[in-house]
Amino acid sequence: VKAHELITSRTDHPLHVGITEAGTLFSGNIKSAVGLGIILYQGIGDTIRVSLTGDPLEEIKSAKRILKTLGLRKGGIEVVSCPTCGRTQIDLIGLANQVETLVQGYDLDIKVAVMGCVVNGPGEAKEADLGVAGGKGVGILIKKGEIVKKVPESELLSVLKDELDHWGK
């Protein structure tokens, strides 16, 4: 971070920023998000590079997500999910991972919430464009904070996919 701040104070040339040899997917993403977040928040940098020990495609996904989180990039669905708690009545971790995999095929600039119970899920998903929640065999689809459909829990993913396929049409 200090090196980027120093060079920016001494030149007007475009600057490529990154955290070199950040590490594995887990630790490298954390180091890159923190380091690049600080640098980019200060308005430093014209291009970025995330360096991870692993698949280069993961570097691209990470870079895009860092930019989107900072409000510097549009496009790509943001998935949010609640932490597991005593009210969780669904395989929330599994469902959230399935939703993250599903949304990679879409270039929509929306937020999708994955909630662990049908009681608090709709309220917690209010800021999302779409959301799913479930428990005790029942699933709900939430659109702009309103419950729009009840389905068997096993159909949540396919109902969400249908909504994404028709989003904005």
Task: Annotate each language-model stretch with its function.
Residues V1-D107:
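Catalytic alpha/beta core domains of metabolic enzymes, predominantly
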Residues G18-I30, V112-N120, G134:
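Glycine-rich beta-to-alpha transition loops that act as phosphate-gripper elements at the mouths
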Residues I19-T20, Q42, L52, C85, ...:
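Fold-independent oxyanion-binding glycine-rich loops
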Residues A22-G23, D55, R87, V119-N120, ...:
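Short, glycine-/Ser/Thr-/acidic-enriched flexible segments
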Residues I39, C82, C117, A125, ...:
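Conserved, mostly hydrophobic/aromatic
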Residues L95-K126:
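Hydrophobic alpha-helical bundle architecture
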Residues K136-I142, E146-G168:
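Beta-strand/loop-dominated core regions that host nucleotide or nucleotide-derived cofactor-binding catalytic loops
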